[in-house]
Amino acid sequence: MLELLYTALLYLIQPLIWIRLWVRGRKAPAYRKRWGERYGFYRHPLKPGGIMLHSVSVGETLAAIPLVRALRHRYPDLPITVTTMTPTGSERVQSAFGKDVQHVYLPYDLPDALNRFLNKVDPKLVLIMETELWPNLIAALHKRKIPLVIANARLSARSAAGYAKLGKFVRRLLRRITLIAAQNEEDGARFVALGAKNNQVTVTGSLKFDISVTPQLAAKAVTLRRQWAPHRPVWIATSTHEGEESVVIAAHQALLQQFPNLLLILVPRHPERFPDAINLVRQAGLSYITRSSGEVPSTSTQVVVGDTMGELMLLYGIADLAFVGGSLVERGGHNPLEAAAHAIPVLMGPHTFNFKDICARLEQASGLITVTDATTLAKEVSSLLTDADYRSFYGRHAVEVLYQNQGALQRLLQLLEPYLPPKTH
């Protein structure tokens, strides 16, 4: 009964979704494009019979990059289709893989749209990153006997409590999933408590630890640092949300009193916020350039606004330390491991529930510092910039946490082998 109500409601609210897409398109025009894909209509043919991977957010897409590369290496003859839901996620997929994978939007969870999509792609295996439990998608895959694996699965206590209210509906949903590869024991236990069978759930660890700085990226970062700031300190604030840029800018203004040549790289989380961030910097009276301009910072440049896509790992490589946003406001924080991979200290606000386990490990190992406002942010950045040994201590411990927790990718690949043809590499 709940399935029918859910589907009927989803059809009824489609006009509201169109309005929302159109409104969001004011700041991000890409939201007004490719609507047909959201209903299973595609301009170009898709190669069937391969692997499909869905990642809803930018963070999940980034975590999936090593997995997709490993699958391409092991199964070069299988087409890989990567689906997302947002233009930002789409841009990340295209910048990471180009034409090496097929990329389209995953249709909304409507039976007819999903059937059109699955008829086109006809995957041998479907991977969903983290926790995207779409009832009609899961039902369609189950009916077609297509294996479904939730990779890098996580389930917060808050989300588990919400799902628990749906009782048998969620239990039936979970039992249609082939395998749940949980990030940790807590996540796995929550899935079992909601109705998944013990033999459906295994703990692999988090794929987010399986990132690395390639020699090519490191060399590019060194070159850019020499061009931008050969003799001045640099800090970076990334994935910032509304309400955080003003805090970062206030901290930077205070820091400039002590470090007059300090350079800030400010990277908002969403492209539609780039103009707002630029306005805030301008209103603060700070000298700035944008990354998209291609300009090189002069000695008087105080801020570089990172308004390009797909360059976050490169920009981390330029910085002496990093603040990771979504954490001073209640967004749950963003991935601190991308900064840790560069062996630089990581600062975050108190709201890190999206990365609770990772942040706890970093903080326990002295790789993460928690700040609460502009004053504490400026104070901690000042301490790190003043003392090179202190800065090195936190950076070294941050990257050690990364290395010590790697291995989830290989464990997951082994679990996927029974559902795929024999690997060729």
Swiss-Prot record:
**First-level EC class:** transferase
* Active site residues of this protein: E60 (proton acceptor)
Name its GO BP terms in alphabetical order: Kdo2-lipid A biosynthetic process; lipid A biosynthetic process; lipopolysaccharide core region biosynthetic process
Molecular function in Gene Ontology = Kdo transferase activity; transferase activity
- Record field: transmembrane: 3-23
Site-annotated residues for Transition state stabilizer = E130, K208
Q: How is it modified after translation?
A: Degraded by the protease FtsH; therefore FtsH regulates the addition of the sugar moiety to the LPS and thus the maturation of the LPS precursor.
What GO CC annotations are associated with the protein? Answer: membrane; plasma membrane
Membrane-topology descriptor: Single-pass membrane protein
Localisation per UniProt entry: Cell inner membrane
The record lists CMP as bound by P268, R269, M309, G310, E311, N335, P336, L337, E338
Give the record's pH note: Optimum pH is 7.
Q: Which UniProt keywords apply?
A: Cell inner membrane, Cell membrane, Lipopolysaccharide biosynthesis, Membrane, Signal-anchor, Transferase, Transmembrane, Transmembrane helix
Q: What phenotype is described for loss of this gene?
A: Cells lacking this gene display growth defects, absence of Kdo transferase activity, and accumulate massive amounts of lipid IV(A).
Activation/inhibition comment: Catalytic activity is inhibited by the antibiotic polymixin B and by Re endotoxin.
| Disulphide bond pairs | none
Q: Which reaction does it catalyse?
A: lipid IVA (E. coli) + CMP-3-deoxy-beta-D-manno-octulosonate = alpha-Kdo-(2->6)-lipid IVA (E. coli) + CMP + H(+); alpha-Kdo-(2->6)-lipid IVA (E. coli) + CMP-3-deoxy-beta-D-manno-octulosonate = alpha-Kdo-(2->4)-alpha-Kdo-(2->6)-lipid IVA (E. coli) + CMP + H(+)
Give, as in the UniProt entry, the pathway in which the protein acts: Glycolipid biosynthesis; KDO(2)-lipid A biosynthesis; KDO(2)-lipid A from CMP-3-deoxy-D-manno-octulosonate and lipid IV(A): step 1/4; Glycolipid biosynthesis; KDO(2)-lipid A biosynthesis; KDO(2)-lipid A from CMP-3-deoxy-D-manno-octulosonate and lipid IV(A): step 2/4; Bacterial outer membrane biogenesis; LPS core biosynthesis
What this chain does, per the record?
Involved in lipopolysaccharide (LPS) biosynthesis. Catalyzes the transfer of two 3-deoxy-D-manno-octulosonate (Kdo) residues from CMP-Kdo to lipid IV(A), the tetraacyldisaccharide-1,4'-bisphosphate precursor of lipid A.
Q: What is this protein called?
A: 3-deoxy-D-manno-octulosonic acid transferase
Organism annotation? Escherichia coli (strain K12)
* Organismal lineage: Bacteria, Pseudomonadati, Pseudomonadota, Gammaproteobacteria, Enterobacterales
